[in-house]
From Swiss-Prot:
UniProt name for this protein: Uncharacterized protein 131
Pfam families given in the database record: PHA01746
Feature: compositional bias, Acidic residues: 102-113
Entry-linked InterPro entries: PHA01746-like_dom (IPR048991)
Organism listed in the record: Sulfolobus islandicus rod-shaped virus 1 (SIRV-1)
Matches recorded under Gene3D superfamilies: 3.30.720.60
Region (Disordered) location: 99-131
Compositionally skewed regions (Basic and acidic residues) per UniProt: 114-131
C-alpha cells in the first residue's frame, strides 16, 4: 500500500509527463458507497491537486447523498482531519459555479423547530384537554 505522499508524487509526475489530468481513487477503509478521488491537473507548468467524491458505481456522475451515507461521510471527514496538514500543502480546489444555481443557507436548528411544530398541531387532543 502506497502512502498518500507517494500517491501525490506519482500522480503529479504522471500529469506533468502526459500533460493531462491524472486521477486516482483512494480506498478509505470502511466506506461503502462513496469514493474519494485525488486529481492532479497540469496548469501553467505546475500541478494543481483536488479531491472530489463520487458514487462507487459511477465515477463520472454527480453524487446524490442520503441519510444512509452518513457513516461514509463521517469516515471521509476523519480522513480529511487526519491528513489535513499534508493535504493543505497540495490540494487546492476552487468551486466553479457556472450554472447560476441559487444557493440558500439552512439553519439546522431552526429547521428542526419548524418540523416539530406541525407535529404538535396534528396531535389529537383528548376530551380533558379540549375542555
Amino acid at each position: 500500500m502506497a502512502s498518500l505522499k507517494e500517491i501525490i508524487d506519482e500522480l503529479g509526475k504522471q500529469a506533468k509527463e502526459q500533460n493531462k489530468i491524472a486521477s486516482r481513487i483512494l480506498k478509505i477503509k470502511g466506506i461503502k458507497r462513496i469514493v474519494v478521488q485525488l486529481n492532479a491537473v497540469p496548469q501553467d507548468g505546475k500541478i494543481r491537486y483536488s479531491l472530489t467524491i463520487h458514487s462507487q458505481n459511477n465515477f463520472r456522475k454527480q453524487i446524490g447523498i442520503t441519510p444512509q451515507d452518513a457513516e461514509d461521510l463521517k469516515l471521509i471527514a476523519e480522513f480529511l482531519e487526519k491528513y489535513s496538514d499534508f493535504l493543505n500543502e497540495y490540494v487546492k480546489f476552487t468551486p466553479r459555479n457556472n450554472n447560476a444555481i441559487q444557493e440558500e443557507e439552512i439553519d439546522m436548528e431552526q429547521q428542526e423547530e419548524k418540523e416539530e411544530k406541525p407535529r404538535e398541531k396534528g396531535k389529537k387532543k383528548s376530551v380533558e384537554e379540549e375542555f
